[in-house]
């Protein structure tokens, strides 16, 4: 990643970037600092490292190298920004590298995780599979194994909407994936296989809930053995062996690796979102699940966040999570109306969902058998 003779900067200053800085520093790599296009809400110093706006960076070494620790669809744009400032050595962070580095770092920190063999019984390394998936050449496809998974009751619901930009790469061609139009009650049909405004639904809450309207719909209306949620441009790259573990009960859920937050999850969240929303969420937990209120605060005072609202789980676990989650969000909606001005796309419940996802999973690590798998971005 760096030959040791150049300054290494991490481009980005949010969770992906901070996690990679933690992982690299833990194994002895020197990191010169973070670089962002515009500072926005980013702090001036992040975990002891300076955060520079690219226009303010004073590094006369044109050979300095940059790790682009942001979603892949931003890599080309950032390469152009760097080139405009005279920097031409940039490496985009790919899913395989992120998964390898963060797995090692989290394992070293004692983060609990149930692991399958490195090759999942396939003879192909996890890194190779993640890299191939990112290149749109792996993940379950319409072959015999994927057909068997579908026949066994595995369904991954892909939240998509009319606002989604076109992608160069398609989702994996697999019968386990089903596109679902999110917020279908509020927008024209887009040709998705399914809609979230059928049956029992909160489709009209989509401006505040984003993909969680699809999660709710899958909870209330689908009866699969294994349910999962993916997004139009990202998904969890699970292997057949990991789906098999869900089906035979040796695992309960597949999750992305958690992000590392600084100085803690609550502070990082509030840096980019309304602190009032976090306060309303804690009040809702105290009202709906009072026995978990103290635990929730303790978890958000820690460093880990499960992001993206993506999971794949046995139906009993998926449904239990939803039965826990949605009453909290309903309480926030009912008791904090100022967070939801009319005719706005606030995404408040969608963002709070990520905090609640983290609280639910981390607080149940001693009861649930959790597997962590790579997330893949489509571009």
Task: Pin down the residues of each PLM region.
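Phosphate-bearing ligand-interacting subdomains
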Residues: 39-128
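Extended catalytic core of nucleotide-activated donor transferases of GT-like folds
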Residues: 20-22, 53-55, 71-80, 140-145, ...
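A short, charged/proline- and glycine-enriched loop
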Residues: 3-7, 64, 149-155
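Short internal beta-strands
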Residues: 32-38
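ER/Golgi luminal nucleotide-sugar-dependent glycosyltransferases, focusing on the catalytic module
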Residues: 108-379
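Short hydrophobic segments within beta-strands
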Residues: 10-11, 35, 69, 157-159, ...
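A residue-level structural signature of the nucleotidyltransferase/glycosyltransferase Rossmann-like core
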Residues: 8-9, 66-67, 234, 309-310
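Glycine-rich adenosine-cofactor-binding loop
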Residues: 4-24
